[in-house]
From Swiss-Prot:
Protein name stated in the entry: Glutamate racemase
Enzyme's top EC category: isomerase
A single MF term (Gene Ontology): glutamate racemase activity
An example Gene Ontology biological process: peptidoglycan biosynthetic process
Gene3D superfamilies assigned to the protein according to its UniProt record, in alphabetical order: 3.40.50.1860
Role: Provides the (R)-glutamate required for cell wall biosynthesis.
HAMAP family listed in its UniProt record: Glu_racemase
Pfam families in alphabetical order: Asp_Glu_race
Catalysed reaction equations from the record: L-glutamate = D-glutamate
Lineage: Bacteria, Pseudomonadati, Pseudomonadota, Gammaproteobacteria, Pseudomonadales
Active site (catalytic residues): 75 (proton donor/acceptor), 186 (proton donor/acceptor)
Gene giving rise to this polypeptide: murI
Length: 264
């Protein structure tokens, strides 16, 4: 039986999962959190499924060794490639995963046209195709891979002229085709939501799944009587350059923190 005070492990290919971690901290302030940015291997979206599955196995084993009571795969690409295997490896461990918000977007659109910004890996995955078949049969979905955007966000570049131009090159054709609802299909992308809100008409809806994941985590912990009640701590790990991650934490997490090296 896991300890209520045990931490929750959260990981992503880089710092994008901090958008999910913020939602978890807001809704579950008593939960201690372990966050691992696998920045030595970012971006996952351009890697093979087997490569990503191996990274998932390594990171999940690390969190289990640290005594984590639950695992959040805060990465759409890692979910698509690796979460099924993780659930087979750790059947007793609550594992919460990400997927693009196709269902809420299909319900929200008024024009019947939904746009998706995501990584190549997510858009090519069988899981994404299944989501479209299940929830988007009655709407038109325009998909757009976003090469280079994760790297810009990793560097804390959330509003430069180059980032603006990159985004507009992707979203303007969607708008021209009647898109009124845009899915942010990568956990990095909520960090450029403020920029998108500046660039897009006010009636364009932006949808991501960070808050839904935090709610799902709360439900799973409550079902297992694992909700914490004491003081919470956060520890950060990085397989890339910990100092580089520490520099962007004030921007993306909202405060400074020590980042420990994760040898991989």
């Amino acid at each position: 039986m896991a300890d209520c005070a045990a931490p929750v492990g959260v990981f992503d290919s880089g710092v994008g999962g901090l958008s999910v971690l913020r939602e978890i901290r807001q809704r579950l302030p008593h939960e201690s959190l372990l966050y691992l940015a696998d920045s030595a291997h970012v971006p996952y979206g351009e890697k093979s499924p087997e490569y990503i599955r191996e990274r998932c196995r390594v990171i999940a084993a690390f969190f289990v060794e640290k005594g984590a009571k639950a695992l959040v795969v805060a990465c759409n690409t890692a979910t698509a490639a690796g979460v099924t295997e993780l659930r087979e490896l750790y059947p007793q461990l609550p594992i919460i995963a990400m997927e693009p918000a196709v269902k809420p977007a299909a319900l929200a659109t008024r024009s019947g046209v939904v746009g998706v910004l995501a990584t190549t890996g997510t858009l090519k995955s069988a899981k994404f195709a299944a989501l479209l078949d299940r929830f988007a049969a009655d709407v038109r979905v325009i998909t757009q891979p976003c090469p280079g955007l994760v790297e810009r966000i990793e560097a804390g570049d959330l509003e430069s002229a180059d980032t603006r131009a990159m985004l507009m090159g992707w979203v303007e054709p969607m708008l021209a085709q009647g898109c009124d609802t845009l899915i942010l299909g990568c956990t990095h992308y909520p960090f450029i939501r403020p920029l998108l809100q500046q660039l897009l008409p006010n009636d364009i809806r932006l949808i991501d799944t960070g808050a839904a994941v935090a709610r799902h985590l709360r439900e799973m912990l409550a079902e297992r009587h694992l909700l914490a009640s004491g003081d919470a701590t956060q520890r950060f790990y990085c397989s890339g350059d910990p100092q580089r991650m520490a520099r962007v934490l004030p921007i993306l997490w909202g405060e400074n923190a020590v980042v420990e090296f994760f040898p991989s």
